[in-house]
Amino acid sequence: MSSFEERERAEEAKFAFDAELRFKAEARRNKHLAYWACDEIGIESANDRANYLAEVITADLTEAGPEDVVVKIKADFEAHSVQIDEATIRTKVAEFDELAKREVIDEAK
């Protein structure tokens, strides 16, 4: 095998590894967001929290990026008369995104 082929395989492996880390970080971000939203809405039982997490995960499958999750959480806050605006939700998305990335990278070490 030539050094070019070895380098190509290494780059492909790194790309796959990075994609897996991104996927795990997005899933972790959504988990943090869902549980934060549960706290704000007042969802307390473990079963209800798990169901809400599943709803957030399903919402995230609609389109790339966190936009669909923001829309879902905002609608849920409005439905439960929670006075948290979209800007605050987006701030939480950014915070939890960074937290999730750090957690996933630390676990991968």
Tell what function each PLM region has.
Residues 1-109:
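A charge-rich, low-complexity, intrinsically flexible signal that marks solvent-exposed coils, linkers
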